[in-house]
């Protein structure tokens, strides 16, 4: 027997899944780990906790699969993107907690870069916006605020990486400092047209090139394992950012196919072929993957808060005891009773890109009860996704005829039905909603010749067809957009 081990390092948990040569699941493991919030708008991880949680589930998944390590033909890796780490090349010790993609501490730096006339440079070469979401300004903050970091970086003593780089470093015993093209494209430092680190971008952010990892293909053996507890020599054969991995895992291998992953945030990608499409609607142009030196591109819209709004109802408000309860609670009412929740807890992502927006709950009366708020929270995910898809359709010049979905919240039938209603198009949910891990496994399987483990565009789906009239949808969207306008700019210091 031959198998693929997929590592899926996310924002709130690490997981590992072992797939057989036909794509069937043999064993899984998952472990949560904490986020830290040292100041309002700041979000951090402990790099050691990232690695230790990923290491533990890797071991557990293989044990639960009931196969020897010698059966693992390759390892695929996918990860939360943009989260930024800085560590000592000699010791492997981090210099600071990882700054998470949700973190907004560099909003003013982004303002300064725009004011200095750099926005066009970054937009044209990276396909991204000058926003705190991306890695480049986070790395600049670390260099400016960690004592001695800039001097040591210029001396070549430090390594920068996104989470894929950190895990590859750990898996190879510090022998390899790499990142794949999809992760590199999320840093504000990579020219997506040439596929290389861009000297002008580095200069604009004052970042030494000595910090940077080598950029590699998303599918291909880049090294082998060399860490305690894991046999040496297992090929590391696939690496991609989580949303690009999900696009691949959903079988969206042709231009015009789109998917939405509902995780902590919601992430929508549309494959656009082998040429990047510049967005006129504040979407991101990004690398989908690079295989055999050929780059596929995508349009992307990122919603910062999706499933995290359910966590907030559970942990912040105590409205539910577990996330699984929300659908049953929301079904107790036929609608939200006019309540709208805009979960701009960390600003708004695409297509608004407003770091100063903040969450609001509007439309409440004395008749508003827990189920109305629960339903408004679920509907907020669908409203945000619909805004992004509308912008994609304009940029790409075509209509999304169906949306493929995955991620934890895609198991919620109420949410998926409302998403189909708003889109006016079918929503297709695969039997296996772990498309992120499946994509990483498929990229690795491709590299080691296990083609049976690769995803099919014709996989079995559960379909949700639209039911609401277009008039009702237009009314609901208009009210949602009015609520969004009220949330906009709330934290801005207008004085």
From Swiss-Prot:
GO biological process, alphabetically ordered: glycerol catabolic process; glycerol metabolic process; glycerol-3-phosphate metabolic process
Keywords: ATP-binding, Glycerol metabolism, Kinase, Nucleotide-binding, Transferase
PROSITE patterns noted in UniProt: FGGY_KINASES_1, FGGY_KINASES_2
Family classification: Belongs to the FGGY kinase family.
GO CC annotations on file: cytosol
Alphabetized NCBIfam families for the sequence: glycerol_kin, PRK00047.1
Binding site residues for glycerol: 81-82, 133, 242-243
Molecular function GO terms recorded: ATP binding; glycerol kinase activity
Pathway(s) served: Polyol metabolism; glycerol degradation via glycerol kinase pathway; sn-glycerol 3-phosphate from glycerol: step 1/1
Activity regulation behaviour: Inhibited by fructose 1,6-bisphosphate (FBP).
Enzyme Commission number, as recorded: 2.7.1.30
Catalytic activity: glycerol + ATP = sn-glycerol 3-phosphate + ADP + H(+)
Membrane-traversing stretches: none
Protein name, entry field: Glycerol kinase
Matching HAMAP family: Glycerol_kin (MF_00186)
Function: Key enzyme in the regulation of glycerol uptake and metabolism. Catalyzes the phosphorylation of glycerol to yield sn-glycerol 3-phosphate.
Residues that, per the record, bind ATP: 11-13, 264, 307, 311, 408
